[in-house]
């Protein structure tokens, strides 16, 4: 099976959802809210989830969906529900044929709430299951930095398709990723990338558009002949990865370049196209289990670009255990040629 149709629908669904998330940012988040006000994220999360699940339901009605949000909050908060509906109801791709493929406009606010609730699958080892993160990188979203709309298809626990929209990443693969990438990008000119992969068929990127799908080009991780020259990509939030341990791993490997800090699965996408080399997400809490929607699409995109993705013990990520990566601890992603060396350094630092 080729999975080309699944990839096509996933890309269009993600693309349409990013039209909403950018609208929410510009109307609700930009310069008007304190960082403690989560309502723009809430609105974007629920709205993007509704739009993407609608597209999956229209094209693959029997597939299951694992998503983060449930509509019970909205059924209790009528004002919030009405505001989300106001923003969602007119969102469409400018290309009519592409938009119809996704099911067109949602018919009503009630239909929107019902469809949000279709993301409650428990996951597991059998069947076709979509893992959806409507806004990955909530703090990045609020500060106008990096966030991603992420969708992956699992079949019998194996990731077959991944699509990630990064509205604030530069389209140019060769663009220098500096520390400023994490703030105030505001989907400026030259920003907005859609990454995707099919298992066994490589990874591609294309510019995000508001209409039909743009032309793609294949992407791959860059060779790292000297590990000391490698560049780390890591999270901005200290609560998501143990940054002191990350620094110790870098030191052990002789890496002196400053780490690039960015939110969301944009980290997976950045190393997949050679704008960085190593992504570490080292455990902060002993009992924390990573959510499958935070990793499914990025895991495949990196592997299909010539990388390897494992946990801190060197085990591949197991997406068959339900809604979390219950069998894994942490994440280490790097080019295949240096993965063992990175894992070895991680084990030394974490005393595994």
UniProtKB/Swiss-Prot annotation:
* Residues that coordinate or bind adenosine 3',5'-bisphosphate: 138, 240, 264, 267, 281, 294
Q: Which UniProt keywords apply?
A: Hydrolase, Magnesium, Metal-binding, Stress response
Quote the Gene3D superfamilies the UniProt record gives.
3.40.190.80, Fructose-1,6-Bisphosphatase, subunit A, domain 1
Top EC class for this record: hydrolase
Q: What induces it?
A: Down-regulated when grown with elevated levels of potassium chloride.
Write out the residues that bind Mg(2+) 2: 133, 136, 294
Q: Name one GO molecular function term.
A: metal ion binding
Would the keyword Cell inner membrane be found if you checked this record's keyword annotation? no
In this chain, AMP is annotated as bound at 240, 264, 267, 281, 294
Q: What is its EC number?
A: 3.1.3.7
Q: Provide one Gene Ontology biological process annotation.
A: sulfate assimilation
SUPFAM superfamilies assigned: Carbohydrate phosphatase
- The catalytic residues are 45 (proton acceptor), 138 (proton acceptor)
Detail which positions bind Mg(2+) 3: 68
State the family it belongs to: Belongs to the inositol monophosphatase superfamily.
Q: What is this protein called?
A: 3'(2'),5'-bisphosphate nucleotidase
